[in-house]
């Protein structure tokens, strides 16, 4: 998501994030893994399930430290007042914009070269989240294994369906910190915040999935970005009928995280956009 901030002011309605205000202990998560059902055929976006096929239900308990959640949230985003720049001339403006660009990059925000626009630094968010989520990812993996999951694709499906199970809600472009300061987040949340809030949009849920998968070296992940939407690509061998792209000589199976979709299946309108080349790939280093 891209956020534009005017040079002199920023006037977006703010809502406060309070997911770490309550004491967190062991959180229980229950979800269905659609990858375990047997699809007889797809007709457009509708799956016709083979008679007698069932969907595996997964449950796990996860412990999250409130201090870690608070630290993750506070590390991400920049004060809105930073985006109000006073300058003498164009040279002074360019200098101050570069300084802002460098400061923002240390808080997970990219300032674009064209104009005063800000986007999420997906690499920064994932790289600053894997350590916090490794125990969560191991818990999900162990839960799946107890249910008979063995292959890498099956385990990826367990983690993807976990992220998909979070309620779909769009975060605001800003949050308010404990001091009442407006913080620009470009409409995304840190994965720990998404986890404890139990909701997020395509960006935040994809960041949660990528961070979980990367934390246990389960699979390489990239992001596919198109107009007002984002989904993930995973570097595994495509199965028959999987939706996939080829990027830098590798096959990437597509994963829709905003809603419950099986690995390798995305909405048909998104496939048409892919075929027409209306997307870009964000590699996660």
Predicted regions and their residues:
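Bacterial N-terminal signal peptides that target proteins for export
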Residues: 1-8
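Bacterial N-terminal signal peptides
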Residues: 9-16
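A structural boundary/capping signal
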Residues: 19-285
């Amino acid at each position: 998501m891209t956020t534009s901030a005017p040079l002199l002011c920023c006037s977006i309605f703010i809502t406060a994030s309070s997911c770490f205000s309550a004491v967190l202990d062991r959180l229980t998560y229950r979800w269905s893994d659609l990858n375990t059902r047997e699809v007889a055929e797809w007709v457009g976006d509708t799956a016709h399930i083979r008679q007698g096929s069932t969907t595996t239900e997964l449950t796990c308990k996860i412990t999250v430290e409130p201090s870690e959640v608070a630290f993750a949230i506070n590390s991400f985003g920049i004060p809105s007042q930073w985006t109000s720049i006073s300058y003498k001339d164009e040279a002074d403006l360019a200098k101050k914009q570069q300084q802002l660009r460098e400061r923002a990059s240390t808080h997970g925000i990219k300032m674009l070269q064209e104009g005063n626009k800000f986007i999420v630094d997906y690499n920064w968010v994932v790289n600053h989240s894997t350590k916090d989520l490794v125990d969560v990812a191991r818990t999900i993996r162990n839960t799946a294994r107890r249910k008979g999951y063995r292959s890498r694709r099956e385990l990826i499906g367990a983690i993807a369906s976990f992220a998909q199970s979070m309620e779909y809600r769009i975060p605001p472009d800003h949050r308010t910190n404990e001091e009442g300061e407006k913080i620009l987040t470009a409409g995304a949340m840190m994965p720990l915040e998404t986890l404890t809030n139990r909701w997020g949009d395509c960006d935040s849920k994809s960041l949660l999935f990528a961070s979980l998968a990367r934390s246990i070296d389960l699979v390489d992940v990239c992001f596919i970005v198109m107009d007002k939407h984002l989904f993930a690509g995973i570097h595994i061998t495509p199965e028959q009928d999987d939706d996939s792209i080829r990027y830098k000589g590798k096959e990437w199976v597509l994963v829709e995280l905003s809603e419950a979709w099986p690995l390798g299946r995305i909405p048909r309108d998104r496939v048409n956009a892919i075929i027409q080349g209306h997307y870009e790939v964000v590699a996660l280093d």
